[in-house]
């Protein structure tokens, strides 16, 4: 599979990423902005989407019945050099399945 994303700077306060027919406003403002995700939040969102898509892929194979699922992520970043030093996540599944089956 191949993927394509195009991102462009709108102004000093934000950028716009597009893929297929979807658009995502990017927080590229040095001061930050509340109405858009910054690069780390986008990375965590992509990781959450991968986990949720994995759940969608596996549940039919295992004949699971789920009513909902959510992923909570948090990251810690150091400043010098700038890098993520920790990513922690929790997956919460709403299902009538037994704990033993959910552990699969």
Where are these regions (language model features)?
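Extended beta-strand/beta-hairpin segments
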Residues: 1-45, 53-104
């Amino acid at each position: 599979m191949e993927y394509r994303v195009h991102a462009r700077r709108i102004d000093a306060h934000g950028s716009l990423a597009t893929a297929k027919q979807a658009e995502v406003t990017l927080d590229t403002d040095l001061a930050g902005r509340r109405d858009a995700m910054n690069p780390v939040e986008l990375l965590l969102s992509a990781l959450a989407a991968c986990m949720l898509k994995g759940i969608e892929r596996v549940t039919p194979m295992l004949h699971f019945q789920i009513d909902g699922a959510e992923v909570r992520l948090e990251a810690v970043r150091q400043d010098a050099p700038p890098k993520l030093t920790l990513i922690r996540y929790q997956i919460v599944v709403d299902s009538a399945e037994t704990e033993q089956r959910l552990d699969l």
